[in-house]
């Protein structure tokens, strides 16, 4: 199906372009979201009549997104999650979780705007891209940790996936790797085996 784009759509084209897309993509996404019109003569005339209005609306949305991007760019957000000693999360941090975190901080971000290839499954610092507008993209840092104290330590550059990093000096000496029993070591005990 051929459609006329009413705004810039990534990987398709700019506003006003006539592009050929699959029927399902047009029917289920582009047309209901108001991002495109079917490419026929009546709609082409309608688009040309509204072009200036659409461009002004697009420019207004872009300037609003740019203002939010200035406030958001480079900011760091902390997500506290439970995780194992190796840093593996019990669960994951998805686009929905990130959107809720940003909304709680006062930024209006939809989960569809967060560009994340796969959910985050380990603790640490992660850069996340957010598309506030098709032409405005911003990157924020997500600090995923077990506690707020750990998040501060991670922000300073510490790696928190070892037992010493997690427990500090409180770790039991017998739990240190060098004190583990080695079954291949020579036994030099006081007992004689006959």
UniProtKB/Swiss-Prot annotation:
Gene Ontology biological process: translation
SUPFAM superfamilies per UniProt: L9 N-domain-like (SSF55658), Ribosomal protein L9 C-domain (SSF55653)
Region (Disordered): 169-194
Signal peptide coordinates: none
Keyword Nuclease attributed: no
Keyword tRNA processing: no
Alphabetical keyword list: Ribonucleoprotein, Ribosomal protein, RNA-binding, rRNA-binding
TM ranges: none
Record-level GO cellular component terms: ribonucleoprotein complex; ribosome
Family annotation (InterPro entries): Ribosomal_bL9, Ribosomal_bL9/RNase_H1_N, Ribosomal_bL9_bac/chp, Ribosomal_bL9_C, Ribosomal_bL9_C_sf, Ribosomal_bL9_N, Ribosomal_bL9_N_sf
PROSITE patterns associated with the record: RIBOSOMAL_L9
GO molecular function, one term: rRNA binding
Function: Binds to the 23S rRNA.
Entry's family note: Belongs to the bacterial ribosomal protein bL9 family.
Protein name: Large ribosomal subunit protein bL9
Originating species: Mesorhizobium japonicum (strain LMG 29417 / CECT 9101 / MAFF 303099) (Mesorhizobium loti (strain MAFF 303099))
Gene: rplI
